[in-house]
C-alpha cells in the first residue's frame, strides 16, 4: 500500500527519547489548544456573571460523562493500530480504523438521543436548582452539545487513529484550525453586538452600536458557547475524515471496512470497553462531585468551574504526553521490544514531573490574579469566587506533579492493552480518594469547597504511588495482538 504522505514517527528503532518527544509534542500542543475551548468559553461566559459560570460547571459534568465514554472506546483504535503497525500488519490497521469509526459513531448517536431527552433531569440530579438562571443556562448548553456530539466524536476518532499510526502532527493542525474558529466566534455568539467588551478593547465602540442597530443581535448567552464549540469541532472533524479516507495520514480504510464485523467489534469492546467504563465512572464521578460541591453554594460551584479550567492547563498536557507514551509502548510491544517500551514510560515520567514542578512554582505567587481572569470583578459574589479559586492553586497545585506521573503510568498500561488494570487504577483516584474526602469535609468538617482542594491533592499523591507500585510488578508487558491470527484475517478489500 502507498504511504507517500505518511507523517508517522518511527519510535521502534534507534534513539528513543528524541522521536518520542517529536511524537508527543504535537499531542501536548493539541491538548493545550483543546484547553483553549474551555478557557475561551469560561472567559466570555464569565462576562455574564456567576450564574452563567456555575451553569458551565453543571453542564460540563454531564458533557464530560458523554464524551468520556466515546473517547474511551477510541483508545481501542489507538492500541490496535499501534500494535498492528509495530507488527507490520498495515492492512489490518486500516480495517480497525474503519470499524472503530462506525462503532463509535453508533454509540454517539445513541448518546445524543437519550441525553437530549434526559438533560433537565440530569441537571436536577447534579444539584442545579430548577427554575434558576443557572439551571436554564445549563439545560440549553447541554442540549446543544448533545445535538452536535457526532461531530465531537468524529474528531476524537480521527485523533485516536492517527495517533496510533504515529502521525500526531495532522491532528494538531486540525485542532489549531478548530480552536482559532472557536476563539473568533465565541464573543459574538455569546454576547452579540450589545455591550460586548471586545469592541471597546479593539477601539471600535461605534462599530458595536452600528452592528447592533442593524441586526438587533444580542448573542445567545451561554448557549452561544456550545454552538461555537460544536461548529468549530465539526469543521475539524469533516476535514479529518476526508484526510483519513483519501489515505493522506498513512491509514487507508475502504468503504468495506465500515461494515461492522462481529470479531472486530468484540476486539474493540474488549480493549476499549474498560477504558470507556473507566471514563464513564470518571465522568459520573465528576457529576457526583459537582453535586457534592453544590451543597456548599453557587459560589463554590463557580469556583470549581474555574479550577477545572485551570487544572486542564496541566491535566491536558499530561494526558497528551501519556497518549504519546501509549503509542510508543504499543508499537514497541507489537515489535516485541519490551525493554524499550518500559524505558519510554520512565523517560516520560521524568519529563512530566520536571516540567510540572517548574510551572506550579511559577504560578504560586499569582494565584489570585490568575483566578480573577475568569470572572468579571464587581459582578455578584465575584470576590468570594476568586478567593475560593485562588485557594485551589495554593492547596492542590503541588500535587499536579504526581498527577503527571500518574497519567504517564496509565498511558503505558493502556498502550500495552492492559486497559482493565488501567481502569481500576484510574477509578480509585476519584472514587476511593477524592469523592469520599470531599464529602466528609463538606458535610461533617464544615470546610466547604476547601475540602475538595485538599481531596484533590491527596488523591493525586496516593494514586500515583499505588499505580507506580502496580507498574513495577511488570505484568503489563504482554502484547495483546495475536500476530499470526491478525495478519491473516481477511478484510473486505482482500
Where are these regions (language model features)?
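Helix-loop interface residues and adjacent transmembrane-helix termini in multi-pass membrane transporters
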Residues: 36, 47-50, 84-87, 164-165, ...
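Generic alpha-helical transmembrane segments of integral inner-membrane proteins
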Residues: 24, 28, 32, 36, ...
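Small-residue-rich hydrophobic transmembrane alpha-helices
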Residues: 53-116, 152-171, 303-365, 403-422
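Short alpha-helical transmembrane segments in multi-pass integral membrane proteins
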Residues: 1-22, 81-148, 197-272, 329-398, ...
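Cytoplasmic helix-loop-helix junction between adjacent transmembrane helices
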Residues: 127-131, 135, 145, 149-176
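Transmembrane helix-bundle signature of multi-pass secondary active exporters and lipid flippases
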Residues: 27-79, 145-152, 266-331, 355-359, ...
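Helix-capping/transition residues at the boundaries of transmembrane alpha-helices
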Residues: 45-46, 82, 163, 171, ...
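Alpha-helical transmembrane segments of multi-pass membrane transporters/permeases
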Residues: 161-212, 223-226, 339, 343-352, ...
Amino acid at each position: 500500500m502507498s504511504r507517500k504522505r505518511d507523517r508517522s514517527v518511527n519510535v521502534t528503532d534507534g534513539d528513543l527519547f528524541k522521536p518520542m518527544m517529536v511524537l508527543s509534542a504535537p499531542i501536548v500542543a493539541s491538548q493545550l489548544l483543546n484547553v483553549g475551548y474551555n478557557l475561551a468559553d469560561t472567559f466570555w461566559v464569565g462576562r455574564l456573571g456567576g450564574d452563567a459560570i456555575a451553569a458551565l460547571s453543571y453542564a460540563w459534568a454531564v458533557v464530560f460523562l458523554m464524551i468520556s465514554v466515546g473517547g474511551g472506546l477510541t483508545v481501542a483504535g489507538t492500541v490496535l493500530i499501534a500494535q498492528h503497525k509495530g507488527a507490520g500488519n498495515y492492512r489490518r490497521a486500516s480495517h480497525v480504523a474503519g470499524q472503530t469509526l462506525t462503532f463509535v459513531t453508533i454509540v454517539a448517536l445513541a448518546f445524543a438521543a437519550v441525553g437530549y431527552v434526559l438533560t433537565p433531569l440530569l441537571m436536577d440530579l447534579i444539584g442545579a436548582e430548577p427554575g434558576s438562571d443557572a439551571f436554564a443556562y445549563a439545560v440549553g448548553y447541554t442540549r446543544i452539545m448533545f445535538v452536535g456530539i457526532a461531530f465531537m466524536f468524529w474528531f476524537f476518532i480521527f485523533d485516536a487513529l492517527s495517533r496510533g499510526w504515529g502521525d500526531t502532527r495532522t491532528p494538531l493542525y486540525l485542532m489549531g484550525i478548530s480552536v482559532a474558529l472557536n476563539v473568533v466566534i465565541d464573543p459574538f455568539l455569546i454576547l452579540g453586538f450589545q455591550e460586548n467588551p471586545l469592541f471597546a478593547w479593539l477601539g471600535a465602540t461605534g462599530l458595536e452600536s452600528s452592528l447592533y442597530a442593524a441586526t438587533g443581535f444580542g448573542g445567545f448567552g451561554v448557549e452561544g458557547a456550545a454552538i461555537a464549540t460544536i461548529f468549530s469541532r465539526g469543521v475539524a472533524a469533516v476535514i479529518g475524515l476526508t484526510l483519513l479516507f483519501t489515505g493522506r495520514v498513512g491509514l487507508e480504510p475502504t468503504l468495506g471496512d465500515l461494515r461492522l464485523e462481529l470479531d472486530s467489534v468484540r476486539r474493540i469492546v474488549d480493549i476499549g470497553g474498560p477504558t470507556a467504563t473507566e471514563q464513564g465512572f470518571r465522568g459520573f464521578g465528576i457529576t457526583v462531585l459537582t453535586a457534592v460541591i453544590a451543597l456548599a453554594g453557587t459560589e463554590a460551584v463557580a469556583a470549581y468551574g474555574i479550577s477545572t479550567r485551570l487544572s486542564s492547563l496541566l491535566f491536558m498536557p499530561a494526558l497528551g504526553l501519556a497518549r504519546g507514551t501509549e503509542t510508543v509502548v504499543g508499537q514497541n510491544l507489537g515489535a516485541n521490544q519490551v525493554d524499550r517500551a518500559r524505558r519510554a514510560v520512565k523517560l516520560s515520567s521524568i519529563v512530566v514531573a520536571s516540567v510540572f514542578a517548574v510551572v506550579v512554582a511559577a504560578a504560586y505567587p499569582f494565584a489570585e490574579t490568575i483566578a480573577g481572569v475568569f470572572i468579571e470583578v464587581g459582578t455578584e459574589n465575584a470576590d468570594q469566587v476568586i478567593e475560593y479559586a485562588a485557594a485551589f492553586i495554593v492547596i492542590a497545585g503541588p500535587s499536579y506533579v504526581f498527577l503527571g506521573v500518574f497519567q504517564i503510568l496509565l498511558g503505558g498500561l493502556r498502550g500495552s492493552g492492559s486497559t482493565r488494570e488501567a481502569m481500576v487504577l484510574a477509578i480509585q483516584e476519584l472514587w476511593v480518594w477524592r469523592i469520599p474526602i470531599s464529602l466528609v469535609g463538606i458535610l461533617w468538617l464544615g470546610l466547604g469547597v476547601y475540602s475538595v482542594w485538599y481531596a484533590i491533592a491527596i488523591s493525586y499523591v496516593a494514586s500515583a504511588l499505588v499505580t507506580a507500585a502496580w507498574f513495577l510488578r511488570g505484568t503489563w508487558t504482554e502484547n495483546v495482538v495475536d500476530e499470526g491470527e491478525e495478519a491473516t484475517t481477511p478484510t473486505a478489500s482482500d
